[in-house]
């Protein structure tokens, strides 16, 4: 008997994990072949530009706490406003995807407005205005990420492109975490926002080189609707919940990783070097996801990676031992880069226009927003980092509920 989850999933563009082609990739329209590796890289930049601040969250948080004298709670509120804005933007664009045929124009407008908000943040240099400014910036960035995820979902190269998103983010995160702290110490609190402007500008220059990846035509939508087998929403809901919990747990620790390290008497230079190199090594996780996505089904690699992540998070309890702190950062970095493409690919298989892929982006942003906020309140309220590590590990354990859903998609 045919599995309904599998039937509906295969109506979405091939993610790279299923081993089959459900829709042909979009025809070449831009200056690039629409299903090539360069296309995946440029799509990854498009989907990362509105999210790059997440990869340098530790630098931003530490700059606000050490440079501007804010508490963990205040820094958490500012980062929450940025990421909560992204949640609002991603959620809004998820409902509008089918009504944005000229997505390149929309992306260009969002990028220009995001650059403008970063310029305002630097020029005004007013901590009281940071929350509203970063909220608006987050809304623009979230809409851009949701738009990018939707385009990837209908590109025909979703699995590879989602892996490239993590690859781009971790490379950018490496350079940010490696070099920005020293620049912040030399030039001031607002240096990270110059990095955001640079990333957005590069993406804006790449935009004309990306193929069009149009929405399905009315006839294609009609044929798909006639052939579609109704899909129970439970697997999709579980996927979104798992993606939320995964991002929540990881970001709750990552956003405060500098302060966490200092609480275990680790020197700032050691923490910065460890986190930056761990971010670079974590690129291997995204590369591995791209490889296994072409060769293996979803469930088994995802289950193994989630178990390894649980172990990696618990290793942070022993951060006073330097090799263990290094190992914890490397392990969780690699599994973070590995698991997110799998969750996003699962979400993208539920429709052909990319709307469900955009909802996956919404769940991801919600987790990224709530993690630092809850962690900030927890630490300011008197909780220890050891307790926070245990809480984050418990939240991440919920993600194991997505393994049966992945197995169902594999059948």
Q: Model-derived features: where do they sit?
A:
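Extracytoplasmic gate region of multi-pass secondary transporters
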Residues: 57-58, 235-276
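Helix-to-loop junctions at the C-terminal end of transmembrane segments
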Residues: 89-102, 285-298, 379-380
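Paired small-residue
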Residues: 128-137, 323-331
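Cytoplasmic helix-loop-helix junction between adjacent transmembrane helices
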Residues: 135-168
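Intracellular juxtamembrane helix-capping segments at the cytosolic ends
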Residues: 143-156, 337-351
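Helix-loop-helix hairpin linking two adjacent transmembrane segments in secondary transporters
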Residues: 155, 164-215
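C-terminal transmembrane helical hairpin of 12-TM major facilitator-type secondary transporters
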Residues: 297-343
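A late C-terminal transmembrane helix in Major Facilitator Superfamily
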Residues: 350-384, 392
């Amino acid at each position: 008997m045919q599995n309904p989850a599998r039937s509906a999933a295969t109506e979405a563009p091939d993610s790279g994990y299923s081993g089959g082609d459900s829709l042909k990739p979009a025809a070449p329209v831009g200056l690039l072949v629409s299903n090539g590796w360069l296309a995946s890289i440029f799509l990854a930049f498009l989907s990362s530009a509105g999210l790059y601040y997440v990869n340098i969250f530790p630098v931003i948080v530490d700059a606000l706490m050490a440079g501007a004298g804010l508490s963990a709670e205040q820094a958490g509120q500012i980062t929450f406003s940025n990421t909560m804005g992204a949640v609002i933007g991603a959620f809004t664009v998820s409902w509008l995807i089918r009504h944005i045929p000229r997505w390149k124009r929309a992306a260009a407008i969002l990028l220009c407005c995001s650059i403008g908000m970063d310029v305002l943040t630097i020029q005004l240099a007013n901590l009281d205005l940071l929350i509203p400014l970063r909220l608006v910036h987050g809304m623009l960035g979230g809409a851009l990420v949701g738009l990018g995820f939707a385009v990837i979902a209908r590109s025909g190269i979703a699995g590879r492109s989602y892996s490239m998103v993590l690859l781009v983010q971790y490379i950018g995160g490496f350079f940010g975490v490696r070099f920005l702290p020293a620049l912040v110490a030399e030039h001031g609190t607002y240096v990270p926002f110059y990095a955001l402007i640079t990333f957005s500008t590069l993406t804006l220059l790449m935009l004309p080189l990306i193929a069009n990846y149009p929405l399905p035509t009315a006839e294609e939508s009609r044929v798909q609707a006639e052939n579609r087998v109704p899909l129970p929403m439970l697997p999709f809901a579980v996927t979104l919940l798992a993606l939320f919990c995964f991002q929540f747990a990881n970001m709750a620790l990552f956003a405060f990783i500098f302060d966490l390290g200092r609480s275990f008497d680790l020197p700032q230079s050691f923490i910065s070097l460890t986190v930056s190199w761990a971010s670079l090594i974590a690129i291997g996780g995204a590369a591995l996801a791209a490889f296994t996505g072409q060769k293996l089904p979803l469930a088994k690699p995802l289950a193994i990676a989630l178990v390894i992540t649980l172990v990696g998070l618990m290793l942070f309890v022993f951060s006073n031992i330097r090799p263990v702190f290094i190992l914890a950062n490397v392990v969780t970095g690699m599994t973070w880069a590995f698991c997110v493409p799998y969750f996003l690919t699962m979400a993208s298989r539920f429709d052909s226009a990319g709307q469900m892929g955009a909802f996956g982006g919404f769940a991801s942003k919600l987790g990224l927003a709530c993690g630092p906020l809850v962690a900030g309140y927890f630490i300011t309220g008197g909780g220890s980092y050891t307790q926070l590590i245990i809480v984050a590990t418990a939240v991440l354990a919920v993600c194991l509920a997505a393994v049966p859903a992945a197995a169902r998609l594999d059948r």
